[in-house]
Amino acid sequence: AAGRAFWLQGGDCAETFAAATADSIRNRIKTILQMAAVLQYYSSLPVIKVGRMAGQFAKPRSNDTETRGDITLPAYRGDAVNDIEFTESARTPDPNRLVRVYNTSAATLNLVRAFTQGGFADLRRVHEWNKGFIRDSQFGEKYEQMANEIGRALAFMESAGVDPEQFKAVDFFASHEALIIEYEKALTRIDSRTQLPYDVSGHFIWIGERTRQLDGAHVDFAAKVRNPIGVKLGPKSTVNEALALIDKLNPDREPGRLTFITRMGAKNIREVLPALVDGVTKSGAEVLWVSDPMHGNTFETKNGYKTRHFEDVLDEVRGFFEVHKKLGTHPGGIHIELTGDDVTECLGGGNQVSEKDLESRYETACDPRLNHSQSLELSFLVAEMLRDR
């Protein structure tokens, strides 16, 4: 919030029990670590690495039901609630799934600790991965100079005998949308040192655009726990709403307590965001501003796939940086739906995923994600924005 770090948050739109495997978790962590290395070098700021994982098993839906042909069933609301299979028994909500969410989240966190503390996250290893990405990609030449700069810096430190422990392990935090209040309440504990309540289902939790009503249960719950809290703000958000959320969720104006995650859409970001940032800044509140360039840029293709275009995602991030640069405020971070696998869910990017390509590896349980290559390409482009901020 004070401009002394950059926030990188990424992971699945909706986690599934089936995808909670060591390989899948490792690939997501690897992608986030690769992105963070590039962003950190070019921003000269610490990068706070946050996964949308170990709890992101529930999703709000615009429609309560889904119809296929003549059959209408309850909508899939994430593995925490029901199953994606289109049958009556699978779509029937089952509260026993929440126990499985807890157990799967615990197992995921154990794997995260192993990967981030056991040498897998060594900065030199991450740099070698990035070099491999550049060498194998169709657009590698564009980023080769940037990678070479990082390589020279690492080589200089190695030649000087510098081998800090910080190179070998990283702090990695877990986050999810606090959607199912009963689950979050069941995992709220009183800290023995401070006697304050914390939701121990995750380090960071956020409230979605659909559930951020001031008099709603989600805002009321978030106001009572001491975790850092995020709130999604869409294109219809007003300054008064933002200020009211600050009063409710952070009445003491504690820096870093509240994050506003903007999801405006590329067409709206430059028109809507300035008034929000300016109004909040003038109020004296110190919030962290993070760009979610995914949710405001979703559309359906002619062949029936929900998708996003890489250029729209990039343009929203670019607009986010432009607004903050003009106002003299800190573009605090990005919030990305991504996977470490080579899926084909979002269009464009250096590998030019086409509408026809969507058919080959469209694997998401909910919304489309950037694949490994698109995620890394975005990090190099955001790194350029950070350097010029």
Residue locations for each model-derived region?
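Non-transmembrane, aqueous-exposed alpha-helical and coiled segments at domain scale
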Residues: A242, R257-W289, H295-V343
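Active-site-facing alpha/beta catalytic cores
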Residues: A14-E15, A19-G265, R308, E316, ...
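Short glycine-enriched loops at secondary-structure junctions
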Residues: A54, M294-H295
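N-terminal basic/disordered segments at the start of proteins
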Residues: A1-F6
